[in-house]
Amino acid sequence: MVVAPVGFQCRECVAQAAAQTQQTSGRAVPGRGAALRRPIVTYVLVGICAVAFLLSLGVGVESVVGNYGMRPVFIAIDGQWYRLLTSVFLHWSILHIGFNMLVLIMLGPTLEMVFGHVRFTLLFVLAGLGGAVASYCFSPLTTASVGASGAIFGLMGALI
């Protein structure tokens, strides 16, 4: 007899259970786990934000924010609803993008592995849109708002 957390078990039963456990420990879907371990979407999102920031440096941050940032007056009067999405990928300064991307790199791989690529992408985009809508609702009409902070806070909320 072998002492076990649930009492005593015979040696043959323990050996048989161990053999069955070793036989069934393979992956259910071969190769899928390896693909999910690569945080592709996280790196793509960081890349999009970085390229948008570098382009805005070349053209002028104020110009890019003026044309694509979340400005309630343009959404309310001109119906430029695309600004709610484009503002998520724009940033004011190197510190702004740096801290947002740092947190995205810290949280993204874990959440992407848990949720999968598609649901992680939807989480990021919908949380970013939610942040932009909140900014739209609570900001003065002439204020410009940009950044992935709403999406980042959505990712933090998903960890809870």
Where would I find each of the regions flagged by the language model?
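Cytosolic juxtamembrane regions of integral membrane proteins
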Residues: 3-41
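N-terminal TM1-TM2 helical hairpin plus the immediately adjacent luminal interfacial "cap"
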Residues: 38-148
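Membrane-interface micro-motifs in multi-pass membrane enzymes
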Residues: 144-160
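Short intrinsically disordered, low-complexity coil segments enriched in acidic
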Residues: 1-8, 93, 100, 156
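Solvent-exposed, non-transmembrane amphipathic alpha-helical segments
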Residues: 16, 21, 29-34, 71, ...
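Solvent-exposed, charged/polar functional surfaces in cytosolic regulatory/catalytic domains
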Residues: 16, 110, 159
